[in-house]
Amino acid sequence: MFNDLKGKRILITGSTAGMGLATARIFAKYGAKIGINSRAFSQKVDDVLTELTALGGDVAFFPANLMDTSECERLVKEFTEHFGGMDVLINNAGGLGGRANLESIDDEFYERVMDLNVRSALMTTKFSIPHLRASAAESGQTSCVISTGSIAAREGGGVGAGIYAASKAWLHDIHRNWVKEFAKDNIRFNIVSPGTIDTAFHDGKSDELKSNIASNIPMGRFGDIEEVAPTFAFFASHACSGYITGQILDVNGGQIAP
């Protein structure tokens, strides 16, 4: 189904664990050229490189703290120099950044959550646009940006997670704006919006709370990262989604239905 991904140059931020790594595995199986990213190199990163290479990917690691604009720029520069360009950008870096109710939010908390989820995607996309534009012009097909959204963007998030939810809603909406600006360049923008997925994001929750959350999901359970990853491949494939842009694909077991 995704055979046109072979040789595609794909940068995935926040991709050495969890959903980002599961997504990298899909692309590796189809022979893509993959840039994986986290803040720093570690033995775990070395293990990930070995695993993805064994699956068939041409893989390189690019450390960067994407809460810093200059690091976003450096990441894109190093990736494109290594692989000779970029065909797909996946903005997966992000996270809760902590919890704070309205009356306890301060500038430091606000900036941390927004830098983690907004600045990282905004600036990495900004510096990627010239390369994605060139990719589309050279190939005669579309290039694309895929960002990881969240169910929280639609339902407001849990208590203390309002800034996180707002940051994801911002991401959902800015994609709509980018569609208007860059469709003429054959760059597509789509969102994968997971619901409650079994990742480290939920490690702090008690078993009782997790069970209660699962009971309110029509499919009766948390999703698995392997059930989310193929949606990124779908959006990355020109053959599958070359006429799809500006969309938000919910992967949530029916937790919220349009």
Outline where the language-model segments fall.
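Conserved glycine-rich cofactor-binding loop
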Residues: 16-18
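Conserved glycine-rich Rossmann-like NAD(P)H-binding loop of the short-chain dehydrogenase/reductase
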Residues: 30-46
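Amphipathic alpha-helical dimer-interface segment in Rossmann-like NAD(P)H-dependent oxidoreductases
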Residues: 77, 116-139, 179-180, 184, ...
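Short, small/polar-rich loop/turn modules that mediate ligand/substrate recognition or access, typified
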Residues: 85, 183, 188, 240-245
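Substrate-binding pocket helix/loop in short-chain dehydrogenase/reductase
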Residues: 100-102, 106-114, 202, 209, ...
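Catalytic Tyr-X3-Lys loop
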Residues: 103-123, 146, 171
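Catalytic loop of short-chain dehydrogenase/reductase
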Residues: 137-170, 175-184, 196
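C-terminal substrate-recognition "lid" of short-chain dehydrogenase/reductases
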Residues: 221-251, 256
